[in-house]
Amino acid sequence: MKPIVCAIDAERIDEVWPLVEPHITIGVEAARGELTVYGVHQALVDGDMLLLMVYQEKKVIAALGLDITVHMSGKRTIGVTVCAGSQLDEWMVDIIEALDQLGAEMKCDAVVIIGRPGWTKKLAEHGYSRAYVAMSKEI
């Protein structure tokens, strides 16, 4: 059975939260202290982030938190702030299509995905290129 991607309205976050929280938690753990599970939940409930949920055969297999950024230039981007799941190869194309569609609906100019290096090769096959490199040092 093909995975299904659906956007969850802010009003329904608490209803689906027990199903997506394990995935969000994994994504937060990979965020190097920049996110918290509570903060992601609150942003979703407040409508400051959008939740995409991927499910297959009545089981959630991935969750993504998206946000819109309006840059100083006026450029609008839709970005993946947090993402985790299993069976990536089965749903990645569907997520890319959903990001393109949502971005267009929200009048965005680009999709921005910040992730680990392994994403670069997978996303290049779908028209993405490395925009910049971020480096970090704990102090």
Label each PLM-derived region with a short phrase:
Residues 114, 129-139:
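Conserved catalytic-core motifs of GNAT/GCN5-like acyltransferases
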Residues 1-35:
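Short amphipathic alpha-helix that is part of the acyltransferase structural core
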Residues 75-124:
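Acyl-donor binding region in acyl/amide transferases
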Residues 29-49:
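Active-site rim helix/loop that mediates acceptor-substrate recognition in acyltransferases
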Residues 43-45, 57, 71, 104, ...:
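Sterically constrained small-residue positions within well-ordered secondary structures
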Residues 48-89:
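Conserved donor-binding loop and adjoining core beta-sheet/short helix segment
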Residues 48-49, 125-129:
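Short glycine-aromatic motifs
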